[in-house]
């Protein structure tokens, strides 16, 4: 036995020396390399690279953004989680504890936020809200003519066909305030056929894809023809290609969060949440996902650039003296607006912004139709969020789709923003409080995803 073992070791040594002599000795590939080897350099359809985004986000933006999102104005979000699914009836509700959402008690939400979720100032919040949609024109006669006109214009705009999302009726008895800090986005155990169906309907019916083209790794479809799919994708116009990449990037961002805040330990004493590298590998490893994982991560960076560009464009709206992050606490409101403007000016200084002028730049009639298709497809995706069986997943799905929809609304409203008056009501361009809260929280999710990728790079360095 000893002689045989010695012979085996000797043979292995000879093989190693031969490989070394031929220059073939290589260190084993790490999991970090398999997940991130393609997540570098310049992004498709952009002039920006991954490394610039990492440095800007992780060291200049992320810490300040997290501080802003912890403030009262941004942590409370009103949402209706009881809306029925408009597409199918057989929703299997997740019964796990971690799928549940704990709404706020009435006395937990600042009065300034509860009084009117779409108004920005103390003066505007004195306006009595109408009890029913049919009575929105019945404005308090004690208000000035200018204010009455502003309220009617806001309502008209908020109900207009320019919206990229199906907006919840926040006056509905089923709409409740949720503290986002107490209901964080993390792994809930919601998976399987129901979760697959949500994403399948989003990709198959809302991303401009014909049924004859099969998505890579599509559930239940057998082995995909990857080259066929990407040849089709590259043949699309830039707008439709961008649409797919935005949805893929959002999907990737959600999966990063589920891997970064995974339930590692669940006992009667405590729950321990943290990074699950195995879960991350299953979702993004280049070998395990047949090359799809790294592509999805690149799409996450593309999504980051789109929302970053929208925030840079909307700066004039927030700079107006009349705008406040109104909660009723004057000192805190002033500090939060100062921090908000500091963040937006930092974003404005980003050197490699996405150029949205390439969107809808052709024939006017064709561009108008394409923009409308773009809007309707995204609006439909926002409706699909009401079909998610996990309430916590539904909460964050609705918030993030509304946030991305708001970003798209901003990008396609550049002229309206440029023509806003420096003071007084803005009739042409308006953002509700719901849109503002979802916009910044959605970008906060993507910013956190980019930050978490750095953590996973380090954690996977020594994993093979």
Swiss-Prot record:
It is a peripheral membrane protein. It holds the Pfam family ERO1. It comes from the Eukaryota. One of its GO terms (molecular function) is thiol oxidase activity. Residues 1-23 form the signal peptide. Coiled coil: none annotated. GO terms for cellular component: dendrite; endoplasmic reticulum; endoplasmic reticulum membrane; extracellular space; Golgi lumen. Enzyme activity is tightly regulated to prevent the accumulation of reactive oxygen species in the endoplasmic reticulum. Reversibly down-regulated by the formation of disulfide bonds between the active site Cys-94 and Cys-130, and between Cys-99 and Cys-104. Glutathione may be required to regulate its activity in the endoplasmic reticulum. Belongs to the EROs family. Oxidoreductase involved in disulfide bond formation in the endoplasmic reticulum. Efficiently reoxidizes P4HB/PDI, the enzyme catalyzing protein disulfide formation, in order to allow P4HB to sustain additional rounds of disulfide formation. Following P4HB reoxidation, passes its electrons to molecular oxygen via FAD, leading to the production of reactive oxygen species (ROS) in the cell. Required for the proper folding of immunoglobulins. Plays an important role in ER stress-induced, CHOP-dependent apoptosis by activating the inositol 1,4,5-trisphosphate receptor IP3R1. This is ERO1-like protein alpha. The lineage of its organism: Eukaryota, Metazoa, Chordata, Craniata, Vertebrata. The gene is Ero1a.
């Amino acid at each position: 036995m000893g002689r045989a073992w010695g012979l085996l070791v000797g043979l292995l040594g000879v093989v190693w020396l031969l490989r070394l002599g031929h220059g073939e000795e290589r260190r084993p590939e790490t999991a970090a390399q398999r997940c991130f080897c393609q997540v570098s350099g310049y992004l498709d359809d952009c002039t920006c690279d991954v490394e610039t985004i990492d440095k800007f986000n992780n060291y200049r933006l992320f810490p300040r953004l997290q501080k802003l999102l912890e403030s009262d104005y941004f942590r409370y979000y009103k949402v209706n989680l009881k809306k029925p699914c408009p597409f199918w009836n057989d929703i299997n509700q997740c019964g796990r504890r971690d799928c549940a959402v704990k709404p706020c008690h009435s006395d937990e939400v600042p009065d300034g936020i509860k009084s009117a979720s779409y108004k920005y100032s103390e003066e505007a919040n004195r306006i009595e809200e109408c009890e029913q949609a049919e009575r929105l024109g019945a404005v308090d006669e004690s208000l000035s003519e200018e204010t009455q006109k502003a309220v009617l214009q806001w309502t008209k705009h908020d109900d207009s066909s320019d919206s990229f999302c199906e907006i919840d009726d926040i006056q509905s008895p089923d709409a409740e305030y949720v503290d986002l800090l107490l209901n964080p986005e993390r792994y809930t155990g919601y998976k399987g056929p129901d979760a697959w169906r949500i994403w399948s309907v989003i990709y198959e019916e809302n991303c401009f894809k014909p049924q004859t083209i099969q998505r890579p790794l599509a559930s239940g479809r057998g082995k995909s023809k990857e080259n066929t799919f990407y040849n089709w994708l590259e043949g699309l116009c830039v707008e439709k290609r961008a649409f797919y990449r935005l949805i893929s990037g959002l999907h990737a961002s959600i999966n990063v969060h589920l891997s970064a805040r995974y339930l590692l330990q669940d006992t009667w004493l405590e729950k321990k949440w943290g990074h699950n590298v195995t879960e991350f590998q299953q979702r993004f490893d280049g070998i395990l996902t047949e090359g799809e994982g790294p592509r999805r991560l690149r799409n996450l960076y593309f999504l980051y650039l789109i929302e970053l560009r929208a925030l840079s464009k909307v700066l004039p709206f927030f700079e107006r003296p009349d705008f406040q992050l109104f909660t009723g606490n004057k000192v805190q409101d002033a500090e939060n607006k100062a921090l908000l403007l500091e963040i937006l000016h930092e974003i404005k200084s980003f050197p490699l912004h996405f150029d949205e002028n390439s969107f809808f730049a052709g024939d006017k009639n064709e561009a108008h139709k394409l923009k409308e298709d773009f809007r309707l497809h995204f609006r439909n995706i926002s409706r699909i969020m009401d079909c998610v069986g996990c309430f916590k997943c539904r909460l964050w799905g609705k918030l993030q789709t509304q946030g991305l929809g708001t970003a798209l609304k901003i990008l396609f409203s550049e002229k309206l923003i440029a023509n806003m008056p420096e003071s007084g009501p803005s009739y042409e361009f308006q953002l509700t409080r719901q849109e503002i809260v979802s916009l910044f929280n959605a970008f906060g999710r993507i910013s956190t995803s980019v930050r978490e990728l750095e953590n996973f790079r380090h954690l996977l360095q020594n994993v093979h």
